[in-house]
């Protein structure tokens, strides 16, 4: 798989870009703040419908514009597929697939399968559980695009159930039988969609685990062994059954957990049970990595998660596109060599770097330079050969 064309309109610092790409390696070189990362961010957005840098779409639209457009043409086994995404300010985003409008932007998921390595990856080890949940959900969706609808359904039910809990919080409405009956309905919906999402995550973690272990051994052969596991809000007592990923069991366990925590949820006005409170646990030896891993160990573990994702996607179908955003500058020589070895085998690798010295020695790659130019509409990014 490779991206043949990338087009941008009013995306971040890019007022306009039309870039023809090829299989193999392409390096975008430019000073920090010149817009090179925005190119990879646009491709990652086309792959996942999300940014790796911000949680909302508004910052993706260039200042003064009311929408941004990201267009890609992806080639997979000789077949071309065009995706156009319109990111709008204050209204729903739109998408086209092979120039035809689609009802939901989610319909383009799976066209571009990519793996992104970025400085922000350190948050996979050191950050909040939400970072690790997003890693799992993005990867699960790339492999099975239908998971996106499950995530959307779960998030919608979670918002509505939380709003009801807030309206019932404290002692004011405890006797409102109608409201409590409505809460029972939301419990059932939350358990239904939550079980589907948890089952997908658990299946993914079980497949990732041996790949993470192998990748970490490659990156840090003298370190402790790395391992991962799924930690559920259902509690340690249920962990063995939970890790089997049986959907019926998970749905029943979620319903039981919601019932057991109902008084606490009503008191606090928030949902205390469900996959939105779960975590991907990362271990080095017998210690949880977060809070105990050194800087080098944390980087190795973060890279291992991305390398494991690459291997799973490659085993599914065809090589995913590798996006390497300024990561070589963050790595020591051993980790550079390990990542470069993976990149050697990928069909397409797109890399950003501040200076040429950040690129592995001996790499044969097309080089494009990113510059900033002052215009009447502000500073915009441009490419030159």
Swiss-Prot record:
<dbReference type="InterPro" id="IPR018078">
    <property type="entry name" value="DNA-binding_RecF_CS"/>
</dbReference>
<keyword id="KW-0963">Cytoplasm</keyword>
<dbReference type="GO" id="GO:0003697">
    <property type="term" value="F:single-stranded DNA binding"/>
</dbReference>
<feature type="binding site">
    <location>
        <begin position="30"/>
        <end position="37"/>
    </location>
    <ligand>
        <name>ATP</name>
    </ligand>
</feature>
<dbReference type="GO" id="GO:0006302">
    <property type="term" value="P:double-strand break repair"/>
</dbReference>
<keyword id="KW-0227">DNA damage</keyword>
<dbReference type="InterPro" id="IPR027417">
    <property type="entry name" value="P-loop_NTPase"/>
</dbReference>
<dbReference type="Pfam" id="PF02463">
    <property type="entry name" value="SMC_N"/>
</dbReference>
<keyword id="KW-0067">ATP-binding</keyword>
<dbReference type="GO" id="GO:0009432">
    <property type="term" value="P:SOS response"/>
</dbReference>
<dbReference type="GO" id="GO:0005524">
    <property type="term" value="F:ATP binding"/>
</dbReference>
<dbReference type="InterPro" id="IPR003395">
    <property type="entry name" value="RecF/RecN/SMC_N"/>
</dbReference>
<protein>
    <recommendedName>
        <fullName>DNA replication and repair protein RecF</fullName>
    </recommendedName>
</protein>
<dbReference type="InterPro" id="IPR042174">
    <property type="entry name" value="RecF_2"/>
</dbReference>
<comment type="function">
    <text>The RecF protein is involved in DNA metabolism; it is required for DNA replication and normal SOS inducibility. RecF binds preferentially to single-stranded, linear DNA. It also seems to bind ATP.</text>
</comment>
<keyword id="KW-0238">DNA-binding</keyword>
<keyword id="KW-0547">Nucleotide-binding</keyword>
<dbReference type="GO" id="GO:0006260">
    <property type="term" value="P:DNA replication"/>
</dbReference>
<dbReference type="InterPro" id="IPR001238">
    <property type="entry name" value="DNA-binding_RecF"/>
</dbReference>
<keyword id="KW-0742">SOS response</keyword>
<dbReference type="GO" id="GO:0000731">
    <property type="term" value="P:DNA synthesis involved in DNA repair"/>
</dbReference>
<comment type="similarity">
    <text>Belongs to the RecF family.</text>
</comment>
<keyword id="KW-0234">DNA repair</keyword>
<keyword id="KW-0235">DNA replication</keyword>
<dbReference type="GO" id="GO:0005737">
    <property type="term" value="C:cytoplasm"/>
</dbReference>
């Amino acid at each position: 798989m490779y991206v043949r064309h990338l087009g941008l309109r009013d995306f971040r610092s890019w007022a306009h870009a039309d870039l023809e790409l090829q299989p193999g390696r392409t390096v975008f070189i430019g000073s920090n703040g010149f817009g090179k990362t925005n190119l990879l961010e646009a491709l990652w957005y086309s792959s996942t419908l999300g940014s790796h840098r911000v949680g909302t779409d508004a910052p993706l639209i260039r200042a003064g514009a009311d929408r941004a457009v990201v267009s890609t043409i992806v080639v997979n086994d000789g077949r071309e597929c065009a995706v156009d995404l319109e990111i709008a300010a204050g209204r729903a985003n739109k998408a086209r697939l092979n120039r035809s409008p689609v009802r939901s932007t989610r319909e383009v998921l799976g066209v571009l399968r990519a793996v992104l390595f970025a400085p922000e990856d350190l948050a996979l080890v050191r950050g909040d559980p939400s970072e690790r949940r997003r890693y799992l959900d993005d990867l699960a969706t790339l492999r099975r695009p239908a998971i996106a609808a499950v995530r959307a359904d779960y998030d919608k039910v979670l918002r509505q159930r939380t709003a009801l809990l807030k309206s019932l919080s404290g002692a004011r409405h405890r006797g409102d039988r109608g409201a409590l009956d409505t809460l029972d309905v939301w419990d059932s919906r939350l358990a239904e969609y939550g079980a589907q999402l948890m089952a997908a995550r658990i299946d993914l973690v079980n497949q990732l685990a041996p790949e993470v272990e192998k990748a970490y051994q490659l990156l840090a052969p003298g370190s402790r062994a790395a391992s991962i596991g799924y930690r559920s809000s259902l509690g340690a007592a249920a962990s063995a059954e939970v890790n089997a990923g049986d959907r019926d069991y998970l749905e029943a366990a979620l319903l039981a957990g919601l019932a057991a925590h109902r008084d606490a949820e009503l008191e606090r006005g928030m949902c205390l049970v469900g996959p939105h409170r779960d975590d991907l646990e990362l271990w080095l030896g017998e210690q949880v990595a977060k809070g105990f891993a050194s800087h080098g160990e944390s980087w190795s573990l973060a890279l291992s998660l991305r390398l494991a994702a690459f291997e799973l996607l490659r085993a599914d179908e065809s090589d995913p596109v590798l996006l390497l955003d300024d990561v070589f500058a963050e790595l020591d020589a051993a980790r550079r060599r390990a990542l470069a070895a993976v990149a050697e085998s990928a069909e397409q690798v797109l890399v950003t770097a501040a200076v040429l010295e950040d690129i592995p020695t001996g790499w044969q790659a097309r080089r494009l330079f990113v510059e900033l130019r002052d215009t009447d509409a502000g500073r915009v990014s441009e490419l030159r050969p």
